[in-house]
């Protein structure tokens, strides 16, 4: 590295800096720039970076440490655009520590809350608030991509935005799909995006889109999917997983997809594992589920009570729990601020790879 600072020592120092500081250190010399851009350094930096949760509620973004001390202090993030560009309908996706946010003018914004960099993705031409969206990395072409399916008449067309070219392209057309989706937000794993889709209660499946080949296929859901009220896709232990909530049984089930395409159930929890007897005056439902870097489970519940003697603001209650898979124990995550408007939660880790590909 230099006669004054060995490369090993420089790496030990640089991996402890923030992304904002690293952006400045890139300008010190060509050697440091090449080191910071090196894939090996990028992986080391990601592995050593602490994980934080990013949440979206009350039309603002916050950084949380769900696994740290309680009560959790919410640190408001500086949104880079005018606050009027987002509202309750805003859709948020994430990949490699970077968020993809829908804006009210039908454009998208890719934003890294760690480096504070952002980029506007133009409207693909025809956009609806119901279009499914995905954001992920294509390792074959070393490029990040945004995917949306646009339905017109009897055809669903996949449009892909490539950051390498800075433009949208039409990739494939599916005739007469008549598909509906559990959640418009796609789940990213390896080089694939996944959505839960259905035509009817008897025809349910997972839509899988390959970011490298721009091809799609249909994957089966778990065979015991009947009776499920809500379901969410996620990633745990580098495997695609599905969390299912069966309201009649008040049961949460989590299964992972094996390489063979079959499903293996890994967790089954009853509502009583989280909600105390005193709190059961509320009718709690699972609102959404997230996984931590340690493969623990973060479950958010919304409870309803229509008792006429209660004030309107008291009839709805939100609770969040951290379920630790190692010792099979759950603990309530308490916040300094109320959770009434919480709509999105994902774990983000600072990583240089996406910054090096999108923002430079």
Curated annotation (Swiss-Prot):
<dbReference type="InterPro" id="IPR017451">
    <property type="entry name" value="F-box-assoc_interact_dom"/>
</dbReference>
<dbReference type="InterPro" id="IPR036047">
    <property type="entry name" value="F-box-like_dom_sf"/>
</dbReference>
<protein>
    <recommendedName>
        <fullName>Putative F-box protein At3g16210</fullName>
    </recommendedName>
</protein>
<feature type="domain" description="F-box">
    <location>
        <begin position="1"/>
        <end position="48"/>
    </location>
</feature>
<dbReference type="InterPro" id="IPR050796">
    <property type="entry name" value="SCF_F-box_component"/>
</dbReference>
<dbReference type="InterPro" id="IPR001810">
    <property type="entry name" value="F-box_dom"/>
</dbReference>
<dbReference type="Pfam" id="PF07734">
    <property type="entry name" value="FBA_1"/>
</dbReference>
<dbReference type="Pfam" id="PF00646">
    <property type="entry name" value="F-box"/>
</dbReference>
<dbReference type="InterPro" id="IPR006527">
    <property type="entry name" value="F-box-assoc_dom_typ1"/>
</dbReference>
């Amino acid at each position: 590295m230099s006669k004054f600072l060995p490369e090993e020592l420089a790496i030990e120092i640089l991996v402890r800096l923030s992304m904002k500081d690293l952006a400045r250190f890139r300008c010190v010399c060509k050697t440091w720039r090449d080191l910071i851009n090196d894939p090996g350094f990028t992986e080391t930096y990601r592995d050593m970076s602490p994980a934080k949760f990013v949440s979206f509620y009350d039309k603002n973004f916050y950084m949380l440490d769900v696994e740290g001390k309680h009560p959790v202090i919410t640190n408001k993030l500086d949104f880079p655009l005018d606050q009027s560009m987002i509202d309750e309908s805003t859709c948020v996706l994430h990949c490699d520590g970077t968020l993809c946010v829908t804006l009210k003018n039908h454009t998208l914004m890719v934003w890294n809350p760690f480096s504070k960099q952002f980029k506007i993705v133009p409207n693909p031409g025809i956009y609806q608030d119901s279009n499914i969206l995905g954001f992920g990395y294509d390792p074959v072409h070393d490029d990040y991509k945004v995917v949306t399916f646009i339905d017109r008449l009897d055809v669903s067309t996949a449009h892909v935005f490539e950051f390498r070219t800075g433009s949208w392209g039409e990739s494939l057309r599916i005739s007469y799909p008549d598909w509906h989706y559990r959640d418009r937000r796609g789940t990213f794993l390896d080089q694939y995006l996944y959505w839960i889709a259905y035509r009817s209660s008897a025809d349910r499946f997972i839509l899988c889109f390959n970011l490298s080949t721009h091809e799609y296929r249909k994957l089966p859901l778990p065979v015991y999917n009947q009776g499920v009220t809500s379901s969410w896709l996620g990633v745990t232990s580098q495997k695609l997983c599905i969390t299912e909530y069966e309201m009649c049984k008040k049961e949460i089930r989590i299964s992972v997809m094996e390489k063979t395409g079959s499903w293996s159930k890994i967790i089954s929890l009853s509502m009583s594992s989280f909600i105390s007897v005193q709190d059961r005056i509320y009718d709690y439902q699972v609102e959404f589920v997230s996984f931590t870097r340690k493969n623990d489970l973060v479950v958010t519940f919304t409870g309803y009570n229509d008792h006429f003697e209660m004030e309107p603001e008291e009839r709805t209650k939100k609770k969040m729990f951290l379920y630790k898979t190692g010792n099979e124990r759950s603990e309530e995550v308490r916040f300094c601020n109320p959770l009434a408007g919480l709509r999105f939660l994902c774990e983000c880790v600072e990583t240089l790879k996406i910054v090096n590909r999108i923002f430079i």
